[in-house]
């Protein structure tokens, strides 16, 4: 499979994995042929890289948790030591016009996901005094936020659920406020307000501004697997790329451009489905059965999205 060859070459020559405490993490891999290989452990990033080059998986994940025995298959015997606090924002879960029914990665949908990520970071920093350790473009439609500080490592599922509720504004009731907002008055919240006064006041006018659409299961699961930063997303062929805060101040086209792994060469691609639109900056107009020569990164993306097949 040509796509697998491209993946192997990337991992052998270009990949830079961004993960700490490798020896305490469980790793999991989804091969190109399907299935899932779990409970793998490695003593170093170099050992991890050698395994990845040899096996060339389609997807690569690591545990948010740290374990005494990460390679143990019995979860009760792994020896849980703590877990990062991780947030996942996915365009698929956003109820915006740009994100509804998009067959391919849409820059407009990704822009919406980026704005949701900025909103999340603002709440984490200003209201919870939690600073992201790592911000990662998922390589598809969203972003992952990792917090690895000591204060979050021992949080259990219940405490993480409370963080989720806070961020999603669960239980917020505008009728419990009484503040003068223009010509209207509402009741003042008599208990501890949800978040900052600014966020609460905005939410009185529009409750949707209070909520951040995170995947709550990801955040509260202390054994969760998350995509390895620096690896390739097997749905797109784009790099799950670590970012800096300043990257979120720019247009998402800059992020996507930097995440393109396969920049050289063209490939023949036979469409099995019709497609009209823009794919990774390339305008496409094709009917089922059409054979086109496309940039390698576009052809690989389309094959992974099951729009057709790459031909020698």
Curated annotation (Swiss-Prot):
Gene Ontology biological process terms from the UniProt entry: DNA replication, synthesis of primer
Obligatory cofactor(s): Mg(2+); Mn(2+)
One annotated GO molecular function: DNA-directed RNA polymerase activity
Disulfide pairings: none
EC numbers, comma separated: 2.7.7.-
Record function comment: Catalytic subunit of DNA primase, an RNA polymerase that catalyzes the synthesis of short RNA molecules used as primers for DNA polymerase during DNA replication. The small subunit contains the primase catalytic core and has DNA synthesis activity on its own. Binding to the large subunit stabilizes and modulates the activity, increasing the rate of DNA synthesis while decreasing the length of the DNA fragments, and conferring RNA synthesis capability. The DNA polymerase activity may enable DNA primase to also catalyze primer extension after primer synthesis. May also play a role in DNA repair.
Name of this chain's protein: DNA primase small subunit PriS
Primary gene name: priS
